[in-house]
Amino acid sequence: MPQWLLNLDGGFLLWLQDVVRNGILDPFFQFYTQLGNAGLLWIALSLLMLCFPKTRKAGFVSLIAMLLGLLCTNVVLKHLVGRTRPWLVVEGLTALVAEHDPNSFPSGHTCAAFAAASAWCRTLPRRWMKSVAVVMAALMGFSRLYVGVHFPTDVLAGMAVGLFCGWLAWLIWKRLAAWRGWEA
């Protein structure tokens, strides 16, 4: 990674730590970021959506999107890029949660969040549901920065991969629906 990018990424994280972090927000973001462990929050919501006819398609498409995101981020990109977690390379940065995977690029939590949100924005019946999905995904990405376990570029890359996987899952759904004669 170029030194100028490390300085920019690290500087932003140190600013967050010094200016934004506080005793009121810390527990919230620690809790919220851990809801994203293994995609738990997004998988649970997707499975819940499968139970209702009006949201069944959204649940199915988001599960496909998250599976694609998992393959892209955690199976391929993290090992291919091998970027070290920020608290290990940014002097003075303290992580608020423990992460056992030493690779940070791209953010898997953010990828899962935006993969689900992207799928939901294409399939949920109400505008407010789509807005909530986007806000929840953005909060997940921000939480990864707030707790100090990802660089901003990790989160941006996770968001991009997640959006792509949501779009790809939607295309897969449309093909499958056309082939099976289901409503797309």
Roles of regions detected by a PLM:
Residues 45-71:
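Interfacial segments of alpha-helical transmembrane regions
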Residues 42-53, 113-121:
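Hydrophobic, aromatic-rich transmembrane alpha-helices
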Residues 61, 65-70, 74, 158, ...:
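Alpha-helical transmembrane segments in multi-pass membrane proteins
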Residues 64-80, 131-143:
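Small-polar-interrupted transmembrane alpha-helices in polytopic inner-membrane proteins
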Residues 94-184:
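Membrane-embedded catalytic cores of phosphoryl/pyrophosphoryl-handling enzymes
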Residues 24, 54-59, 125-131:
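Membrane-helix interface segments
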Residues 49, 73, 77-82, 121, ...:
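Membrane-water interface at transmembrane helix exits
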Residues 1-40, 74-102, 183-184:
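N-terminal transmembrane-helix/juxtamembrane module of multi-pass inner/ER membrane proteins
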